[in-house]
Regions:
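A glycine-rich helix->loop->beta "capping" turn
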Residues: 1-9, 18, 153
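Residue-level recognition of the N-termini of beta-strands and the immediately preceding loop/turn
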Residues: 4-6, 66-69, 114, 155-158
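Hydrophobic structural elements of the Rossmann-like NAD(P)H-binding subdomain
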Residues: 8, 71, 116-119, 129
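Catalytic loop of short-chain dehydrogenase/reductase
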Residues: 13-39, 49-110
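Short-chain dehydrogenase/reductase
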Residues: 45, 102, 141-144
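Conserved Rossmann-fold SDR core element
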Residues: 99, 106-119, 124, 154-159
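C-terminal helical subdomain
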Residues: 118-121, 130-169
């Protein structure tokens, strides 16, 4: 038996108006983004933990996608090290908080064998990504599937792109 959670969380808050300048964002923008991008995913993972723990097969390798896994959709713009553009405060900050929550969860769940990590799907040509995005949905999905199928213990607590490259925190 195996279980996997891929919580694809690409909600558009106020038609993605969170790409506002510092002088235009509100505390409500920040709070709403934090609730959607960090609080919701973390508490969903917490509620599903009993099922995930029950799905771990001790006879199989730990931290394997064919075991229990919590893989949250993040974004490269949440990388503190790679932030050279600034702005996007609500989205960037709330996804950085999600990354911290996933890193902490990976530490807390290490002994369970449940794989925990954050993944960036890429800048995808969707309603959110727009027409200037770098990849189409087929490239995104096929890359993510390939990456997911290759995950091992070394990826526990990682932050990866859809093409299996590491993103610095």
């Amino acid at each position: 038996m195996f279980a996997m959670i891929i919580y694809v969380q690409n909600l558009l808050i106020k038609h993605f108006s969170n790409l506002r300048d510092l002088d235009k964002i509100t505390p409500e923008d920040m709070i709403q983004s934090y609730e959607v991008n960090c609080v919701g995913p973390l508490f969903l993972a917490r509620e599903l933990l009993p099922l995930l723990k029950a799905a771990v097969n001790p006879e199989q390798p730990k931290f394997n996608i064919n075991q229990a896994a919590i893989i949250m959709m993040s974004t490269a713009v949440a990388s503190i090290e790679e932030n050279s553009g600034g702005g996007i405060y609500p989205y960037r900050s709330s996804k950085s908080a999600l990354n911290m929550a996933m890193k902490s969860l990976s530490v807390d769940l290490k002994e369970t064998g449940i794989l925990v990590m954050a993944m960036h799907p890429g800048w995808v040509k969707t309603r959110m990504g727009g027409p200037n995005a770098l990849i189409d949905t087929e490239t995104c999905c096929s890359g993510m599937i390939e990456t997911l199928n290759s995950l091992t213990e070394k990826d526990h607590g990682a932050f990866l792109r859809y093409n299996n490259t590491t993103i610095p925190w």
